[in-house]
Structure formats: structure tokens, C-alpha cells
Amino acid sequence: QKTIPYRTLEYLDWKTPDWIVYPGGALGNTSSCGKCLMELYQWGWIKKIPRIAVINAEGANTLDVLYNGKFEDTELRWNNGNFDVELIERYYTKMNDDGIRPKTKATAIQIGKPSNLVKGLRALEYTNGIVISVTDKEMLDGMSVVGLNGFDCEMASGAVPAGIKKLLNDNIIKKD
């Protein structure tokens, strides 16, 4: 998974984009991208660290809930490795007690307890990243955008154009 950003940046002659956007499920791609960016920056191969945006499905948005303080009004952060493990445990307990299960048609990101949550937090901290959620309808619209260009993608990948659209509309990602 670390190869994806590596090869992309190599293709771009090590000129980094402002943003790298991933759908958020288990957060393996997010954490691998963060690790790749750390290494490339340490080696001096890239001069600027792009920001990572993680796009959760609204029905499977554990990272969005925890990262953006939607549970107990506390924003979960990597905090140089001193993340609040008790906050994660309390949220997972609430999920279990309340019968909260991930629900989205985007099955590739239909994950309630991301296995790479902590590593994802590290990547977000390192890149000054952000997390948002999009609806299933927005992901379907994102798939349509990809389709208009002659490509096909599954629903979770449709989260990326949907998230970019939302971030552009919110003026978080700037139009160039």
C-alpha cells in the first residue's frame, strides 16, 4: 500500500500535490500513505508534505466521529503517540451497547472498528489531515463523475470525488 503514493509521486517528479484524498475504512491506505510521506520527506525526496483527507461513509464513520469530537466533545489525536485509548474504548463500548453497526452500501469501507485507527491518526497528525463523511447518495454521484470520464469504480472509491466536491464547496480545498 505504501507503493501507491511512492509511485504516484515518482511519476510527478517528486512534486507533491496539496492534497491526497482516500476513502476511509480500515485506514490501511491512509496509514501507509502517511508512512510513505514521512520517509520521502526524511530522505529529502519531497520538499512539501501534502495534506491527507480521509472520506468516511456516513454510515461507517468511526474516524469522523472520534477525530472531529462528535463523541464526548473530545477530538481524538495521535498526540505524538499519546492518543486517548480510553476514548476509543468508550466509543467502541457505546457502539456495542447501543447496537451501532456500520451501514453503507460501500462495503469496502463498511468498517466500524478500523484496524489501523491509531496508525491513521499518526498519518493525519503528520500531514495536518482532515476527516469528513459523505452519504451513500454522494458516493453514487462520485461514481458517476468517474464514469463520465470513461472509467469504472466501486462505491467506496466514489467517496473520493464526493469528498473532494464537499471540500471544494466548503472552501477547504482551494480551486486552482
Predicted features along the sequence, with ranges:
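Short glycine/serine/threonine-rich phosphate/pyrophosphate-binding segments
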Residues: A26-C33, L63, S157-I164
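Active-site/ligand-binding-proximal alpha/beta "capping" segment
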Residues: Q1-W43, L140-V146
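Catalytic phosphate/nucleotide-handling subdomain of diverse soluble enzymes
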Residues: A162-D176
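A generic structural signal for well-ordered alpha-helical surface patches
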Residues: Y6, K137, D141-S144, G158-K165
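Conserved acidic residues
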Residues: D18, I52, D176
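Active-site/ligand-binding loops adjacent to catalytic centers
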Residues: E39-M155
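Helix N-cap/coil-helix junction residues
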Residues: W14, W45, F151, I172-I173
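Buried hydrophobic positions in well-ordered alpha/beta secondary-structure cores of metabolic enzymes
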Residues: Y6-T8, V21, I52, L124, ...
